[in-house]
Each structure stands twice: as C-alpha cells, then as structure tokens.
C-alpha cells in the first residue's frame, strides 16, 4: 500500500507574509499634562539645551572643568524621612567657541515639585548672560554680589523642599475595663480529653503491679456497645447478664481551690442580685467593616493610524503578490509504502483428558481433568494376601465374584452414578461395591454399632491413616475394632452423664440445630446458653473446645480467592479455641463414588488441635456424638459471684466466649485476672490462646 504525504517547508518570503508585520519604531503614547506642568517642562528643557558659557577677566583668569551640582529629590513615601545624598552630577565645561559642540545630557524622568522661590531662581538663571559681569570670587545674593572668597557656592541649587503631609492621628487608646468573670476564669487550668486512645510501646513485663493496683480503683470500665441481655435456654437458668450505660468516675481532691472558685462563679451567675455589667466587661474582638471593592481603571493606549494599518491581519494579501513557482518551490510530495501485518489468531489448547463445564445458574466456568490409574499386579496380590489374613470372610467374598456380577455392577454404575462420579471406574471401586452388596445380604446395619464406612476401611478396601483414640467401655461397643472413629454410640449410656452440664450454642445457627437442641434438653437438666458468637462453630462444649459441623460434598469446593470452602472458618476457630472438633457429614453416594475424599479430608485436617469424625447425614448420629462430647469435656459453672459476672461485658467485647468468661470468674475477679496476666501466671495464661492473649495485653496498655 502506498500513501502520498504533502510536506511544506519554511518559505523564504518576508516576515510580513501571513502574519503581523514587524513595527519599525516604538509605539508612541500620549500623556495629558496640565498647563503648569507644561510650563515647568519647557523651562527645564531650555535650561538643559543651553549650557553655561563662563568667560574670565584678565585678573581672575580662566576656569576649566568646574563642577556644578544639581540635587534631585528622591521618590519617597509620606511616612519616610528624606535623606538626599548627592551622587549624580552634571559637568559644565567652559566652552570658548560659540555652540560648536552641543552636549547631550541624560534626562531624568522624574516629577519635580517647584515652589515660587525656586521659580524665581530658575528665571534668574534663564536671563543670565553668557559672560558674567561680576567677579567670580564674590558671593551672589538675592540683592546683589557680596565679597567672599568661596568657590562658586552660589551656583549650587538649593535643596527642593516638599510640602508637609498631614500627620495620621492614631486611634485613641482607651483603657479597658476590668472584668471579674474574665479574671476568675483565667485562673482555672484547662483540661482536655482526647477523642482517641493510644497504646504504650513498652512491653507488659516492664509494668509495675503496684502502680496498677493504685490506679485501678479510680476508673470503672464499662461496655461501649448497645445494651444486650444473654438469655439461658434451659430450666436451670440462674444468671441474666445486662449491660449498663457508659460512665467515667474521676476523683478530685476536696481542697481544690480552683474548683471552688469555679463553683463560686457559677453561683453568682444564677444570683438575682448579681451585677449584669460584669458581662459587658468581657473582652470582645473589634468588628471590621468590609472594604469596598476597588474598580480597576484600565489604561487606554492611543495608536497612530499608520500603526493600526500594520496591525491588520491579512495572511493572503502578501502571498498573492508572489509567483506560483516561489510558493511551490518549498512544497514536496513524498510517497511512503507500508504493509499491514495480519494478527495471528491464538486458540486455547484442548486437552483430551479434561472436560470443560459451564454453570448456567452461577455463570461460571470450570474444567475436570480425567485420568486412569493402572493397578500393579504385584501390589494387588500382596494386598489380597493381607486382606485374607485380616478378614477371611470378606477376602473370600471379594475373590469369588463372577463375571455376571461384574457386568451387573458396571451397568448399575453407568446408569445411576454417572452424573455424580468424580473419576473413572477402577478395579478397587468395583470390588468395594460388590463387597458392600454381599455384606448387606448377611448382616444388618442396625444390629451392629459400626457404620458401613468403618467396615470398609477396617477391611482394607481403601487405605486410611490409623489414629488411636482412647475410649471408654461405657461409650463404645468393645467387640469391634475402633481404629476408625465414625461409628454410632448408644443412647442409653450417655443420658446420665450430661446432667447439670453447661454448653453454649451459636445464636446464628439455632434454627439449623433446632432438633439437636430439643433432643438434648428433652430428658436432661442441661444448661444451654445462647451467644451471638462471631465464629462458624455450632456448639461450644467448654471454655477451650467447640464443635463445627461441615459437609463432605462442599469440602473440595473453591472460593473466589482460590482457598477451600472451609479453610477460613477452621483457621478462625483455631485462633479462639485450643481444641476444635469437626463433624464431617457424608452421604451414601459420596461413599460409593469417591472413597478417596475421606483420606484427603483426614490428611488436610491433620492437626494436634483438631479432631475429625465422619458420620452419616442423619440427626440421630449427630445427637449421639454431642452427648458423648458433653459427657467427656463439658463442665458445670455454679461457683461464680454476682460481682464478677457484672464485669463480664469487658471480656465479651474482646471476643471471648461466654464459657471462657465464666471459667475465669470461678477463680479470679476482674482485677485479679488482670494482675495475673501482667505477672504472667501459668494458670491464667493456659486458659487463653495466643490471639486472646495479645488482645488482652493491648487492652492493659491502653492510655489516654
């Protein structure tokens, strides 16, 4: 592709072409002068253009190069004193020839004010002849010449005097009346409370407990948040926490003279016989009037007609006088060739082992990678031998299934479980399904206390990490192996162990756990407290243990930031509790389709402070586990004092749970607990987590 571009270079024409012409001379400005000013200028001009010619007599000789001074007034303001220093001089040369050389003097563009006495002197100088008839050594006065030996002092022009300005009379300085109120209020000290609080940089270990004990009684800490009341949803509710309004107690010495003075002044204000003139003696600022806006008078310049003609802008008037050759001499047309490169279209590579999915409801995209694992023959043989040694019955059943059973199992998988499957069907999954079908024919799940998932894991169908947990015979059925902790427990054993225990329920999840709460409080005297806790836990068993229920189907889901669905909730609970019990609910379909999900959850939640339990999605299993947790870790709180409970709002505002606050007030008061934290006593420190300890230390270092 070729494009033509027209380039215009600088022309060699005159500067007047196409713009303003360069003015040959300076612009003239007309200034209006009065008659008196015109007369003074004429007199000064005639004096400067006619230099003095001084000739000498035979007796006195000639004078060459004598200097005669002309003192000039400096421009000063009305308030400034005039101090004239004679600096610039005019040299008057003795010229013998008649006006052969005319001297050019520098003109001082200053406005001079001449009085009548000085005008007489200028008129005398004008009428002075070129040659002097009187001798030079004589002094000239107004009446004549006097005998004196001075050198030409009479040529010195006297200093021009200026008229005196009017003196600006200052404002009268009136004596101010003394005000009793102003004198009394000025003696008071000003005290201010900042709107924000600060925290000292010193560590808590450098604090002296004696100072804290002395200053603790002077202040009373109150809750800032709006009033709330903590209710007890049980039959044995004994306490009702209520908040009080915010107040500050400041103790002032009784012998404070300044405060007595202020009270005395306030009594005078409400006294009917108090003199009202005292209010008018208070100093007030002087009011200033608004100054009128000065209008700017713009100066008008008068230009001559010739200058106005040159300022007319006609760019084409001069160009028409030039020839075409002169115009197009500096104009060239250049040809440039360029090519357009097409953009390469890039397509996303499609992987043969993945499926791209689109969710029409959530308007999101996703992909699933598909893979097939090839089982090793040696590993399968060793695994079958170990299975036969552990459980002979299950091993015989897994080895005796025929081809018809395999075909039927494949047909069942392809028809019913295909929409929900997560990976390809392998030999391990097929063997697990066949084992489950044959086991259901021989045994019933309701007769045994072991669930189906524990049976599969104990039989060795899919691997799982064995974690030993100490159990008691009163809770579990000791006939079966307890290597995996997702079995149901008996109801009758736990009903007697939860009497007079106290737990807390999260107020945000009361509707979700309504059936569980009704079942726990139905046949037992259990204290149940509702607390609007910020965490995601369902129940709080004691001051350091909570129960959190999650769904196995949502565990591997990702949030918008890329983290797992329950990642943030579990981390927040670990900062507030020393033990977190996680109940994982799963369905029969997930157990059949994706058995690897269980050991992935177990591996991800592998922590010394986290206990994981897998149960079916039924309320009865969850109620049994809650009774077990209450019997094992819950406490009864009956030793609190009413004085200590009144200060519970301070610790609740720090994010502490209600059971932790009641545990603290069983052994400490609020002041004693603060002192124990400052001294870092082990008994008080063990109750709190690291996050709770930092918040409490920050409160203790609070200062105004």
From Swiss-Prot:
Signal peptide: none
Keyword field: Cell cycle, Chromosomal rearrangement, Chromosome, Chromosome partition, DNA-binding, Meiosis, Nucleotide-binding, Nucleus
Keyword Transmembrane helix on entry: no
Induction context: During meiosis.
Keyword flag Nucleotide-binding: yes
GO BP: chromosome segregation; meiotic cell cycle
Superkingdom as given in the UniProt entry: Eukaryota
Location within or outside the cell: Nucleus; Chromosome
A single GO molecular function term of this UniProt record: nucleotide binding
One cellular component term from this protein's GO annotations in UniProt: nucleus
Subunit and interaction comment: Interacts with ZIP3.
Family: Belongs to the ZIP2 family.
Physiological role: Required for initiation of meiotic chromosome synapsis. Involved in synaptonemal complex formation, a structure that tethers a pair of homologous chromosomes along their lengths and plays a central role in recombination and homolog segregation during meiosis. Required for the normal localization of MSH4 to chromosomes.
Protein's name according to its UniProt entry: Protein ZIP2
Annotated organism of origin: Saccharomyces cerevisiae (strain YJM789)
């Amino acid at each position: 592709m070729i494009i033509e571009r027209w380039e215009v270079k600088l022309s060699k024409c005159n500067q007047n072409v196409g713009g303003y012409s360069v003015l040959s001379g300076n612009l003239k400005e007309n200034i209006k002068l009065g008659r008196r000013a015109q007369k003074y200028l004429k007199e000064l001009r005639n004096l400067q253009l006619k230099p003095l010619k001084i000739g000498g007599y035979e007796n006195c000789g000639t004078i060459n190069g004598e200097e005669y001074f002309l003192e000039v007034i400096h421009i000063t303001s009305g308030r400034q004193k005039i101090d004239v220093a004679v600096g610039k001089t005019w040299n008057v040369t003795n010229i013998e020839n008649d006006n052969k050389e005319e001297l050019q003097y520098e003109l001082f563009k200053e406005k001079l004010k001449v009085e009548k006495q000085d005008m007489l002197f200028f008129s005398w100088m004008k009428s002075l002849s070129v040659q002097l008839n009187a001798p030079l050594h004589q002094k000239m006065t107004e009446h004549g010449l006097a005998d004196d030996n001075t050198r030409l002092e009479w040529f010195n022009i006297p200093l021009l005097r200026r008229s005196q300005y009017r003196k600006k009379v200052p404002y009268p300085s009136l004596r101010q009346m003394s005000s009793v109120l102003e004198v009394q209020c000025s003696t008071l000290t000003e005290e201010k409370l900042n709107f924000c609080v600060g925290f000292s940089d010193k560590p808590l270990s450098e604090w002296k407990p004696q100072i804290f004990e002395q200053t603790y009684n002077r202040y009373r800490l109150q809750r800032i948040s709006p009033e709330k009341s903590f209710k007890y949803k049980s039959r044995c509710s004994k306490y009702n926490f209520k908040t009080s309004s915010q107040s500050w107690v400041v103790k002032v010495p009784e012998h404070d003279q300044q405060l007595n003075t202020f009270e005395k002044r306030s009594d005078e204000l409400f006294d009917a016989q108090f003199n009202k003139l005292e209010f008018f003696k208070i100093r007030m600022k002087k009011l200033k009037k608004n100054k009128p806006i000065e209008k700017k008078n713009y100066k008008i310049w008068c230009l001559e007609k010739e200058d106005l003609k040159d300022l007319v802008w006609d760019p084409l008037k001069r160009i028409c006088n030039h020839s075409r050759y002169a115009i197009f001499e500096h104009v060239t047309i250049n040809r440039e060739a360029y090519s357009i490169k097409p953009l390469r279209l890039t397509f996303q590579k499609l992987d043969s082992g993945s499926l791209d999915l689109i969710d029409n409801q959530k308007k999101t995209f996703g992909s699933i990678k598909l893979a097939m694992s090839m089982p090793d023959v040696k590993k399968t043989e060793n695994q079958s031998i170990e299975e036969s040694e552990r459980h002979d019955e299950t091993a015989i059943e897994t080895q005796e299934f025929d081809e018809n059973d395999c075909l039927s199992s494949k047909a069942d998988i392809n028809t019913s479980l295909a929409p929900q499957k997560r990976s390809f069907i392998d030999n391990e999954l097929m063997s697990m399904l066949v084992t489950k079908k044959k086991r259901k024919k021989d045994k019933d799940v309701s007769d045994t206390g072991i669930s189906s998932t524990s049976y599969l894991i104990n039989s060795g169908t899919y691997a799982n990490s064995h974690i030993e947990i100490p159990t008691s015979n009163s809770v579990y059925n000791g006939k079966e192996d307890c290597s995996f902790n997702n079995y149901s427990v008996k109801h009758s054993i736990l009903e007697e162990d939860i009497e007079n225990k106290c737990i807390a329920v999260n107020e945000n999840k009361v509707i979700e756990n309504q059936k569980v709460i009704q079942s726990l409080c139905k046949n037992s005297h259990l204290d149940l407290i509702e607390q609007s806790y910020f965490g995601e836990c369902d129940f709080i068993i004691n001051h350091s243990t909570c129960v959190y229920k999650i769904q196995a189907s949502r565990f591997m889901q990702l949030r918008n930031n890329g983290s797992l669905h329950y990642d943030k909730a579990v981390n927040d609970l670990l900062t507030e509790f020393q033990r977190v019990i996680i109940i994982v609910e799963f369905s029969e379909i997930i157990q059949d389709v994706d058995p690897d999900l269980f050991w992935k959850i177990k591996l991800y939640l592998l922590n010394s402070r986290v206990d994981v339990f897998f149960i079916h999605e039924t309320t009865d299993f969850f109620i049994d586990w809650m009774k077990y947790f209450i019997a094992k870790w819950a406490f009864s709180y009956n030793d609190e004092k009413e004085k200590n409970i009144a200060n519970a709002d301070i610790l609740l505002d720090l994010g502490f749970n209600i059971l932790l606050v009641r545990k603290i007030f069983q052994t400490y008061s609020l002041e004693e607990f603060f002192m124990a934290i400052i001294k870092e006593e082990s008994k008080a420190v063990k109750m709190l987590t690291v996050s709770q300890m930092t918040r409490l230390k920050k409160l203790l270092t609070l200062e105004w």
